[in-house]
Amino acid sequence: MKNRELFSEKNRKNYKMKYFIISFSLFIVLLAICSVVLFMYSLDFDISNLIGSTTTTTATPADEEITNNYSVNELNGKSDLLFIIEDIDGIDFVCVVSTNFDNKSMIVKCVDGSENLSYKNRTLKIDSVYLEDNVVGVKKALADNFNFLVDKYIILDKESLKNVLSLFDGFSVNVLKDVNHKSYDFNLTLTKGKQELSPDMTYRYLQISDNNTRESIICDIIKSVLVAPYAEKSENLFTSFVNSCETDISVIDYAESAERLYIYCYANDKFYPETYNKGDNS
């Protein structure tokens, strides 16, 4: 367990909330619990007191008391993070994770690459918007059509998405209806209901799903990864993630957000994501 000194009131007031929300959202859709570790490495700091052994230990009563004091009520602000999942021809789908700590909400919105949106007084598929104006165009289309104000973006191709999911042990996913998919690429059979899915099965389920189902899957992924055990593995997760994607989120962004992300993972009063139709992105 990290030193209790890390969570002093002085430190909590000094960090920039904006960077926390961006990092927090990142670990939400996929997925790596970031840490200050790499940033410290780059400065040759001694981090022995910041991160302990990877060996599993049993929490003491004192540790449990500290953990139970963490609360998301200390956090505030709002940010929208964009994920673009590419295929050979352009966009497979995009996902926005909109986090608002002021009203304790987290909204997941997916848009298929073939979906038509209003863009510059025209109706275009979001894939066409991406080919025409790249990330800037996609951000404008999402703002005009859904009122999302994207702060940062992450771009993954399908293979990179699969690699990111494989960083985790698996996910507790609510399968919305029976699945019996057979194609040249892969077969997938699932029974309706909540169940544990491997990273590979989760990836396949995402690939064959519509927007509403994708949103539900991603919400379940978020719930599975924003937990204390993954907060303790942040160094390897961070390294693997940034090696798999294109993003405008810097190592410093992660470093300045690590403490609050850690607090959220241990908080007993955390809120959870909802699909776009159920939530409110205002």
Give each language-model segment a name.
Residues K2-F20, F24-S282:
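Non-catalytic, solvent-exposed segments at the cell envelope interface
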